UniProtKB/Swiss-Prot annotation:
This is Probable DNA-directed RNA polymerase subunit delta. GO terms for molecular function: DNA-directed RNA polymerase activity. HAMAP family: RNApol_bact_RpoE. It holds the Pfam family HARE-HTH. Signal peptide: none annotated. Residues 89-180 are annotated as: Disordered. InterPro entries: Asxl_HARE-HTH (IPR007759), RNAP_delta_N_dom_sf (IPR038087), RpoE (IPR029757). GO terms for biological process: DNA-templated transcription; regulation of DNA-templated transcription. The lineage of its organism: Bacteria, Bacillati, Bacillota, Bacilli, Lactobacillales. It comes from Lactobacillus johnsonii (strain CNCM I-12250 / La1 / NCC 533). Residues 14-81 form the HTH HARE-type domain.
Length: 180
C-alpha cells in the first residue's frame, strides 16, 4: 500500500499515521521523523499550525503502532522490513559506538533563567545555611524547661478513676443472652 492507494479519497479523512506508513512504503528506506512529517504535511496539504497541533499525537501513534520501529536518532522504518531476529541488531546503539567522534554539544539554554543576573539562581548543591544551626550546645538542652510532672507521665499505666467507674466487664453469660 502506497500513496497511490489514497488517490480519489478525501485527504481530510486520512490519518497522519496512514499517510506516514504509505510514505515509508513508497520510499523503501529509513527516514528521519522530520522528513516524514514534512512529507505527510505536503501530501495532506495541511498548514504548519494544524501539523504542529497534531504532532504530539502523531509521534505517540508512531511509537505505539506496531508497524513502525525507531532506529535511533529519531530515524524511523517499517518493522516489516526486518526479520524478527534482526530488529535489535539494526537499531543504533550509541553505547556501542565508542570509536565514532562525537559532535560538540552546544551550551543548553534554560528558558527559566534570565541571562543577565545569576544572583537569583539557586544552587541546590551548596550546603543549606540553616543546616549550620543544627549544632546542639549544652545550654540548648536545659533540663529546667521540663517539669517533673512530664517525667512521671511515662510510668502512668492506670486509667483515671473517673473513667474506670464507667467501665464494666463483659462475661460469657452476657454474650450468650444477645443470641436469644
Amino acid at each position: 500500500m502506497g500513496l497511490d492507494d489514497f488517490q480519489g479519497q478525501n485527504k481530510d479523512e486520512l490519518s497522519m499515521i496512514e499517510v506516514a506508513r504509505a510514505i515509508l512504503q513508497d520510499s523503501g528506506k529509513r527516514m528521519a521523523f522530520a522528513d516524514i512529517v514534512n512529507a505527510v504535511q505536503n501530501f495532506l496539504g495541511k498548514s504548519d499550525e494544524e501539523i504542529r497541533e497534531r504532532l504530539p499525537q502523531f509521534y505517540t501513534d508512531m511509537n505505539t503502532d506496531g508497524e513502525f520501529i525507531s532506529m535511533g536518532h529519531n530515524v524511523w522504518a517499517l518493522r516489516s522490513w526486518f526479520p524478527y531476529e534482526s530488529v535489535d541488531e539494526e537499531v543504533n546503539h550509541p553505547e556501542d559506538e565508542e570509536d565514532v567522534p562525537r559532535k560538540k554539544h552546544h551550551k543548553k539554554v534554560n528558558a527559566f533563567i534570565g541571562d543577565s543576573d545569576d544572583d537569583d539562581i539557586i544552587d541546590y548543591d551548596s550546603d543549606d545555611p540553616e543546616d549550620e544551626d543544627l549544632d546542639v550546645d549544652e545550654e540548648d538542652t536545659n533540663e529546667d524547661d521540663y517539669s517533673d510532672d512530664d517525667l512521671d507521665d511515662a510510668d502512668d499505666n492506670e486509667l483515671d478513676d473517673g473513667i474506670e467507674g464507667q467501665l464494666s466487664e463483659l462475661h460469657q453469660d452476657d454474650l450468650d443472652d444477645d443470641d436469644e
